[in-house]
Each structure stands twice: as C-alpha cells, then as structure tokens.
C-alpha cells in the first residue's frame, strides 16, 4: 500500500471513529457534518468527500464499529477451549458487561440505523449484511458445540436468529435506561436462554471462570473487549 493510500485510509478511520462518538452522543438527526469534522479535527469538506451524506456516514460508522467489535473479541473467543465458553464470552462482549460506559455506543448507532432502514434501501442492505454476519457467528459456535456434544441438537441458524433478536431487544432497553434492564441483567437473561435451549449448565461462577481464562490469554492480562 502506498503512503498516500495509508494516509487516506487513516483519515477515513479517524472520521469514522469521530462519527461513532458524535452520533452516539447527539443522534443522527442532531449531528451535522461539521460536528463530525470538528470531532475528527478535519474539515467538513473532507467528510463530504469521503461519505457524501449523513445516512452513508451512519452506515459506515456502524460498520466500522462492528469491525472493531469483531477485532476486539475474536482473539478472546478463539482462545477459549470449549464452545460453551466461547458463546458465553461472545454474549458478554455483546452486552458490554464489565466495560466502559462508551462501549455501548454501537448500540446507540443501531437505533438510528433501524429507524432509517425501512426508508433507505442502501441502509437496509447494510443492516441485513451485518445481521447475517452476526447470526452466522453465533451459529458457527453452536455447531461446534453440537459436534463436541456440549450443546443439544437443534437448528443452529434458528437459534442464532432467536438469540440475536433477544440481544437486540434487550439492548434497546439498556440504551433507553430501563431501570429493570441493566447490562448485567441483559447478559443474565441471554445466558439463561442459551443454557435452557442448548442444554448446558450456567451460573455466575461459570462466568468468573471464563473471565479468568480470557484474562490469561490476553497479552496485557486484561479481559478483551
């Protein structure tokens, strides 16, 4: 890759990172191109050059946040020996349990994306692609657990659809600050569903063991995510 291309890609990532922060804080309707440019330390003209309009910026910002999520969790999940532990860690990361408050920013962007998808075919296409990837990730772990006898026999794709929908629904309540649905409660409800449908035992003690295993595998000794 040429130095110019590297610089161009770096600027684009810088703008996307800024867009995630600003849209999560203000919402897409109240976010202007200048707001993103100011956060990124660049000009509005450059933001328009890369993305053209806000809907494109939203979709690409969420895709950027999605890639960041997979990059942060892939190593931690892969390092765990059992499919059950990999599923537990994947769900924990999606619930942002034990993470900083702004680690839930991606879910705030999803709300804006869902609101726009019915009226914008491009946004709808991006939404569908990200959901397919997420469900496939869940289904892959389920099939691995079925192959080792850890999980009960069921349709992995249908289970992934149900779990993905449950996570989405509970995440909305967390974003809305529902007093009955904290991130920890979201995680517990998701894991109760996983354990019941897949036929394995899960307790908070199980989660502590998974967290310790993730920390041992992380280069700096901290849980990934």
PLM features: what roles do these ranges have?
Residues 18-19, 40, 145, 160:
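Small-residue (primarily alanine) positions within well-ordered alpha-helices
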Residues 11-20, 36, 61-65, 69, ...:
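Generic hydrophobic, amphipathic alpha-helix propensity
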Residues 86, 101-124:
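Amphipathic alpha-helical segments used for helix-helix packing
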Residues 25-29, 79-80, 148:
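Short coil/turn segments at alpha/beta junctions that flank glycine-rich nucleotide-binding fingerprints
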Residues 60, 74-107, 159-163, 187, ...:
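Hydrophobic alpha-helical connector segments
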Residues 2, 52-56, 78-82, 118, ...:
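Residues in soluble alpha-helical coiled-coils and helical-bundle/repeat scaffolds
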Residues 4, 124-128, 132, 146-194, ...:
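Hydrophobic/aromatic-rich alpha-helical bundle segments in the mid-to-C-terminal region
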